[in-house]
């Protein structure tokens, strides 16, 4: 646990090791000033590891309101009385010191469950919702990489004390299998990805070093695979670090469908552009066409054409667009229009998860496409090792049982599904992570689900059941898509 906390803190400090002026500036109304994110992860850690577990007073009073994502939207946070860069770093050190002192009280705790957990995700035919005795309760955590969820909503605490004051059993549930530490670790990884999105949006020369060269791709023609009809297990009831919206595991019957083995490439998006896809209203939904006209979009965000060459801006550097990488920085409406142009559609999130996890031989769902072991650099492109997507075909050992590749890492993948609760959903430990984003009865979801994580996602903060969500207009996120179709 200590190693996990230290690893993600290194990421946070690395992405904020820049001039103070850059830290306090609001680079886009879509994002917070980086100094807000920095102090916010400390406030979240203070809330859960110091106050909730240790029943201690707040490390510093007067900060909960300022760093409450529900009370203050991103566009307004620069006007708050934020801690300055030096103050934010000092606050993080103070909180971490107290959290580690308290950790010693609770004895040995498990490491990231991805390294040791065997997850029995098989559901015998005839079983509906899985509610195994002794399963760890749901674990919501921090702000989603896309910026929709929040880890510290106002309703999570009425004062600057513990959010668990009224629940005598909640303390023990937080410690079960160490999941409160997993919650904090994942939350900070999610904010690290948010910080990278802010860096991508800022203007000016580069501030971040370029990551390692990604694994080489291989020539893989566009191919689709048939996923047979039948039941599979959607979600999880066993994973101790899973958020509440991933729970509970339940049996889902799906008809057969085809899905591409690879995400859509930059080359394919260029073909869509050259075919007039951005200018043909027949390819767009009414809401999508309205967005396209208002935005004036003619290509993915950060792209432009110079003569016959497509260029992009990546963290302040100008470079040609690599044709064989997965396309990223496209919104859901762009993905939907491309799919319609290609005579295809986006997969539902249930289809995506079945293609990613279901093993027809064992009739169980895996934690990752390749199995239950934690991702390595041979499996997937994660953790900002490369500063961007890897070429398609770079990770054959990360393929799922059906042969789909790049299902984890590289780009978040838009799905056709709105963000709704699973049958038997129970919010825990508070409503503001997921429940408040679900549609009210009789309404449709304003959000679309994304799956799989990106090259910027921390390893502890992704698994095949992970559900991200955002508005269909979002482009600053590291998102792409893959195509599917009904089986004839």
Predicted stretch roles:
Residues 1-32, 36-43, 47-61, 65-98, ...:
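Disulfide-stabilized, aromatic/cysteine-rich ligand-recognition loop
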Residues 57, 131, 152, 279-280, ...:
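Residue-level detector of short coil/turn "hinge" positions at structural boundaries
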Residues 104-113, 236-237, 358:
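Short regulatory "switch" loops immediately downstream of catalytic or recognition motifs
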Residues 110-171:
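Intrinsically disordered, low-complexity terminal tails and inter-domain linkers enriched
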Residues 174-175:
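A conserved hydrophobic secondary-structure block that centers on an alpha-helix together
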Residues 180, 184, 189-190, 194, ...:
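Functional-site microenvironments in short loops/helix caps that host divalent-cation chemistry
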Residues 269-272, 355:
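A structural signal for short hydrophobic/aromatic patches embedded in well-ordered alpha helices
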């Amino acid at each position: 646990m200590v190693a996990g906390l230290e690893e993600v803190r290194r990421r946070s400090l690395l992405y904020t090791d820049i001039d103070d002026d850059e830290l306090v500036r609001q680079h886009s109304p879509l994002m917070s000033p980086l100094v807000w994110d920095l102090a916010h992860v400390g406030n979240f850690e203070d809330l859960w590891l110091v106050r909730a577990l240790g029943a201690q007073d707040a490390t510093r009073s007067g900060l909960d309101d300022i760093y409450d994502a529900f009370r203050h939207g991103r566009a307004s946070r620069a006007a708050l009385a934020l801690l300055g860069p030096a103050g934010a770093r000092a606050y993080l050190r103070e909180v971490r010191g107290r959290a580690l002192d308290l950790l010693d009280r609770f004895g040995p705790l498990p490491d990231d469950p991805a390294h040791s957990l065997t997850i029995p995700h098989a559901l015998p035919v005839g079983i509906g919702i899985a509610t195994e005795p002794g399963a760890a309760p749901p674990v919501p955590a921090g702000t989603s990489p896309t910026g929709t969820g929040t880890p510290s909503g106002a309703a999570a605490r009425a004062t600057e004390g513990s959010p668990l004051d009224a629940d005598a059993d909640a303390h023990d549930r937080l410690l079960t299998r160490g999941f409160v530490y997993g919650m904090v670790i994942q939350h900070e990884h999610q904010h690290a990805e948010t910080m990278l999105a802010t860096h991508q949006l800022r203007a000016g020369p580069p501030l971040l070093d370029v990551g390692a060269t990604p694994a080489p791709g291989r020539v893989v023609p566009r191919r689709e695979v048939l996923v047979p009809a039948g039941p599979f297990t959607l979600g999880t009831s066993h994973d101790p670090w899973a958020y509440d919206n991933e729970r509970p595991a339940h049996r889902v019957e799906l008809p057969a469908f085809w899905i591409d083995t690879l995400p859509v490439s930059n080359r394919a998006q260029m073909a869509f552009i050259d075919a007039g896809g951005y200018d043909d209203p027949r390819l767009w939904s009414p809401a999508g066409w309205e967005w396209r006209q208002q935005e004036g979009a003619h290509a993915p965000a950060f792209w432009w054409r110079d003569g016959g060459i497509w260029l992009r801006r990546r963290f302040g550097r100008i470079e040609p667009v690599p044709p064989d990488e997965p396309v990223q920085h496209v919104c859901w409406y762009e993905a939907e229009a491309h799919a319609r142009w290609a005579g295809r559609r986006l997969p539902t999130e249930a289809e995506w998860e079945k293609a990613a996890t279901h093993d027809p031989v064992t009739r169980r769902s895996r934690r990752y496409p390749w199995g239950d072991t934690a991702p390595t650099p041979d499996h997937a492109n994660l953790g900002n090792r490369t500063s961007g997507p890897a070429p398609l075909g770079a990770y054959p050992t990360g393929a799922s049982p059906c042969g789909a590749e790049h299902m984890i890492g590289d780009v978040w993948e838009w799905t056709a599904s709105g963000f709704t609760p699973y049958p038997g959903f129970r919010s825990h430990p508070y409503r503001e992570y997921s429940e408040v984003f679900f549609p009210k009865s009789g309404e449709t979801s304003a959000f679309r689900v994304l799956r799989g994580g990106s090259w910027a996602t921390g390893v502890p903060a992704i698994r095949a059941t992970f559900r991200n969500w955002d508005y269909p207009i979002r482009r600053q996120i590291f998102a792409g898509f893959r195509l599917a179709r009904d089986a004839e």
